[in-house]
Amino acid sequence: HLTYGIKMEQLPQMRKDIAAAKAKFPEMEILLGVEANTMRVAPYLDVAPVQLPQFDILLAGYHYGITHAGMAANYLYRHTGLFHSENSSLLVKNTAMILDCLYANEEAGNHIDILTHPGDKGPFDIEDIVKACADTGTLVEINDKHRHLTVDEIRVAAKYDVQFVIGSDAHVPEKVGSFE
């Protein structure tokens, strides 16, 4: 990502830090994870498939600042009202991007554990997405810092055999678990 992320050379130190934290807090399960960005081209994530086994948990979500993800159109949709149509090609492309990401990675053995803030930053068909999450056993994030999932979208999602996780969207350790 252009502004966030980890450097792969930091992983050995992160593993050491996690081992130390596990020794100090044996009652807690502490995982090393990554929130990969979804893209419209295979492998549909911006983290290389060969790097994924280095993580204990894989999250995926759509974000601005990623190539091959419709950034300009989605930004204009969210901030100007352009492309606002129930059947817009942007909605179709965005939804296909998420479905392709979920199914292709599941088929490749790269299970996505959590889909983060679905519906945020562009038009997405939440019903189709939660069906795919149910099919793949992917948890759906309810995010404290983003506009989506909305209450209405949660009601739609709750009709399916999908599980939720609540995220604080912390980008620094001090914000972990902070909810409003």
Task: Name every feature range the model reports, one short phrase each.
Residues V162-G177:
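Short acidic/histidine-rich active-site segments
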Residues I142-D161:
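Short, motif-level signal for alpha-helix interfacial/capping segments enriched in acidic residues
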Residues L2-D135:
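Extended substrate/RNA-proximal surfaces in nucleic-acid metabolism proteins
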